[in-house]
Amino acid sequence: MPVITLHYEDLEKLTGTDKETIIKRVPMIGADIERVEDEYVDIEFFPDRPDLYSVEGAARAMRGFLDLETGLPEYAIKPYEVSISVSENILKIRPFLGCAVVRGVKFTSSSIKSLMDLQEDLHWGLGRNRKKVSIGVHDLKNVQPPFRYMAVDPSFEFVPLDYTEKMSMTDILEKHPKGTRFAHLVKDFEKYPIILDANDNVLSFPPIINGTLTTVTEQTTDLFIDVTGLGEAVYIALNIVVTALAERGGQIEFVRVIRPGGEELVLPDLEPKERLLTTGEVKALMGMDLTVEEIVKQLERMRFGAAALDKEAVEVKVPAYRADILHNYDLVEDIAKGYGYENIKVKVPETYTPGKSHPISLMRASVNEIMVGLGYYEVMPFTLTSEKINFENMCRPKTDDVTYVLHPISEDQTMIRTTVLPNLLEILSLNQHRELPQKIFEFGEVVSNETTGQHVAAVSIHPQANFTEVYEVVDALMREMMLPYEVKESEDPAFLEGRRADVYVNGKKLGVFGEFHPEVISNFALGYAVVGFELDLNDLIGKKI
C-alpha cells in the first residue's frame, strides 16, 4: 500500500485545522500512521482509496470528516480551448485517452513533488505499474495546441525528460532508466505511442517518459494532463489528478478529444454517479436503525451528495474521483466510518462460540511453509482476469465454467480466474527488469462453475529452467504433505510436449507441471525458459497434512 508524506504546513492550510487533530482523526477514514516527524507525517492509505494519495485529496476528505465542509465537492469547469485528435493507428496499442487543462496553479518545490508522488502512486494503485494507466503532466506554455495522439516508428527522435540530447524511441527503451523499466509495455509493437503538438514538439511517449520541453517547474501555472491506458480507469485517474489540482486553487478546463470516425469526448467528466440506498441495507450491515436524516448526515461527512427521498430511501451522488464505490456495501462502509466505529454499540453474543483456524488457513500455512522452504516467494495477485490472459495467452481452449463480471471497468478484469498460473506469468512479465532466477508461488482461489476452489501454483524463470527442476519441486511438496502420487503424460497445451505431466492422487487428477510452451512464453513477453505447476487442493482441505 502506498505511504503518503503529508507536510503539516500543507495540511493545515488545506484543512483549516491543526496537525494534532488531523493526526488523531485521519486513521478513522481508512489509514495507518507510519511515522510522525516534526515537519510531516507518513500515512499509509488503503489501496481502495486512490483519491487519498495526495495531500489535497486527504485534506478534502478530512474537511468533511471534521464537519468543516460537508457534502459533494463541486468544481467549476471552463469551456475547452484545447483539443487533441486520436489516430486510428494507436487503437490497437493504447486505445484510451483522457485529457484536461488546469490553469492558475501556484507551485512550490514541495507541491511539485506532491504532484509527482500522486502520479506515481496512481500508476501503482490504478495503473498496474503503468500497464492500465499512465499519466503525463505538462507545462502548457511551451507547446502549441491542437495536440495529436498517434503511433510512430521507433526511430522517431526527441529529447526525453532529464536529458539534453535527442534519442530515438528505441534507444530510450534500451538506455533511459524509465525506458528500460517499462519497455515491456510497448516493445512488442511495430510502432510506439506519442503525443505531439501542432509544431511536432513531443509532449509524451506514453507510458514511458515525457519530453523535456514540458517539464513542470515552480514557474509553471498552466498544465496539460494526459492519461493513456487500456480501459476506463483512465478517466478515474484523470478525475483524481484534476480535482487534486483544483483543491490547490487551479481552474479546470475541458479538453475536446476527437476520436477516429469523428466521435468526440469532452473531458474531464466530473458528473457524479447516482445510487439509491435504503435504510434496510444500512441496518443489514451495521446492525443499527439509522434514520434517513442520520444516513444523509454521515454520507455528507464522507463527501457524498445525499438527499432523503422518503423515510426509507436516500439518493446518493458519488464523486467522480471515487474509484472504490462499486456496490451499496461500499456506501454503508463509509456511513459506518462517518458514524464512528467507536460509537457502534457492542453486542455480546448470547452463546459462547470459541473460534479456531479454518481448514483452508491451516492448509495455506502448511503449503506456504513448504514452498518458502523450497526457495519460492509468495505473491498475491488479483483473482479478476480476462479471457485473453486466462485462456488465449495460455494456449488453452475457452471453457464453459467461467464466472464473468457483469459490468467490468476494464478489459483486463472481465472474469474470475479458473487457474492461477496465468497470474504468476503476468507477474514475471512485469518484473523482467529484476535479476534472475525468479521463483514465485501462490496459494489462492479460483472459481469454476460458480464454485470456489483452492489451488497452489508456482513458476520459475531463468536460462536453465527445465522439467527436472519443477518435477523435484512437485515431488518435495507432495512428500512434505505425505501424499502418495503418480504422474502420467499430460496433454495440456500450455506446456511443451514431452516435458509435461499430470499429477494424480488416489486415481484423481490433481494438477499439471512442466516446461511452458514457447508460444506461452512469447505471449507473456518473457525472454527465458519458464517452468511451473498448479495443483487443485480442494479435496485435501481438512485432511491431516
UniProtKB/Swiss-Prot annotation:
SMART domains: B3_4 (SM00873), B5 (SM00874)
SUPFAM superfamilies registered for this protein in UniProt: Class II aaRS and biotin synthetases, Putative DNA-binding domain
Single GO MF annotation: ATP binding
Reactions that this protein is recorded to catalyse: tRNA(Phe) + L-phenylalanine + ATP = L-phenylalanyl-tRNA(Phe) + AMP + diphosphate + H(+)
Cofactor list: Mg(2+)
First-level EC class: ligase
Annotated Gene Ontology cellular component terms: phenylalanine-tRNA ligase complex
Domain B5: 270-346
Entry EC number(s): 6.1.1.20
Residues annotated as binding Mg(2+): 324, 330, 333-334
Chief subcellular location: cytoplasm
UniProt keyword terms in alphabetical order: Aminoacyl-tRNA synthetase, ATP-binding, Cytoplasm, Ligase, Magnesium, Metal-binding, Nucleotide-binding, Protein biosynthesis
GO biological process, any: phenylalanyl-tRNA aminoacylation
UniProt-annotated location(s): Cytoplasm
The family this protein is said to belong to: Belongs to the phenylalanyl-tRNA synthetase beta subunit family. Type 2 subfamily.
NCBIfam families cross-referenced by the UniProt entry: pheT_arch
Quaternary state and interactors: Tetramer of two alpha and two beta subunits.
UniProt name for this protein: Phenylalanine--tRNA ligase beta subunit
